[in-house]
Amino acid sequence: MAQMQREEVESVTTEKKRLDGGGGSSGAQATAFKFNAQAPEFVPRSHTTAPAPQVSPVSGYFYPCFHYNGGCIGGCGGGVCGGGGTGVGTQSSDWIYVGGGDPTAQHQHVHDPAAAFYISNPAVQFPASQNSSSSSKNLLSDDLRLKIVKQVEYQFTDMSLLANESISKHISKDPEGYVPVSYIASTKKIKALTSNHHLVSLALRSSSKLVVSEDGKKVKRTSQFTDRDREELQGRTVVAENLPDDHSYQNLEKIFGVVGNVKAIRICHPPESNSSRPKGDFLMSNKIHALIEYDNTVIADKAVEKLNDERNWRKGLRVRLLLRCSPKSVLKNRRNFDGILIDDELPSYESGEDSPRLHLTESQLDNDGDDNNVGGLWGKGRGKGRGRSPRSYAVGGGGRSFGIGLGVSLGIPSLGSHESSSPKTATKGPRMPDGTRGFTMGRGKPSISLSPNNL
């Protein structure tokens, strides 16, 4: 036993010497090493299974099953989504359809409609402007919904209906006062927000001032705008023309608020030259003008009295009551006034003998035509090419009329025709805006009475 220990010590000493000859650093390490012969026997422990490393999911794989609009991201090619087995689906959409979570239904495209929703598709890259515009115009966000509701409610206000005859015509056509959503969506302000009519209909359902039909194709006001309401509004609304250079809402409110409280202001711009909008949209003028609504008619009358700039008749501010200058009422009154003037001013003659018209014979007409008197003034190309006979001329009853440039008309009976004394067939002369006859003195020249001797 002692001999075996001695041999082991010798072997260790030999090994130590061999290591000392290898180098300084190795010798230092060998000097620090001590062999412990009394150490217990080493017994290896039982091997423990190391945890399996987590395998990251393959890029492009999603669970639950994600589908693009028009294709499946898994590329199963089932035909329902239209992926065609490409592995990435259709890349034409920037939104992903998220279906149900049943793994057995992934390749059958069976999804729960209640749990379906859309998320953004990062795999599809669009330009920033196109991506933002498409997402904003095809999705009904809260901001977009509020803008649509605010704009359409403004279009249905009393002042807008008064200034915009197009919407009023649509309201009058429908027995319930509905306006097509397609027309509302075609306006410039709404088209700038969205071109989707369905989104406009969905947004308007949240309005408390508007009612959308069940099919979502028509919209109307909750309270109808009657003719009585229109007349009352016109009575307390004034029209302002020749507006100042700064015709902003704040500046106009400051100007017209001097006489009383201003409820609403609408600035009406002139129509564009190539615009297809009806002329009824601009009631009063083809220039820029403003409609100012006051609380009552007293304040409106006061505004007309105080705010008119009569010193500058060309470019000064013009303020008028809307009720007094409605085009329809002016046209109606003018027609009635013209009828009264025709019946009162034009005399009727029962026989041709009492008529003061000039009677010229055929020979006199020939002589006058040769002398360039009446015929010369009348017959310079007038009536040529129309198949008219140069021998039949008359004014008043059953003939035709012509003037000689001095505001005087010659009455010549038609040859071979029966004379009739109906005043309705007389040609109307020019009229002034108030309905009175114009150019009664022949543009400032004294009237000349013609007789057969002068001819």
UniProtKB/Swiss-Prot annotation:
One of its GO terms (biological process) is RNA processing. GO terms for molecular function: RNA binding. It holds the Pfam family PAM2. SUPFAM superfamilies: RNA-binding domain, RBD, Winged helix' DNA-binding domain. Residues 1-20 have a biased composition (Basic and acidic residues). Residues 236-324 form the RRM domain. This is La-related protein 6C. The lineage of its organism: Eukaryota, Viridiplantae, Streptophyta, Embryophyta, Tracheophyta.
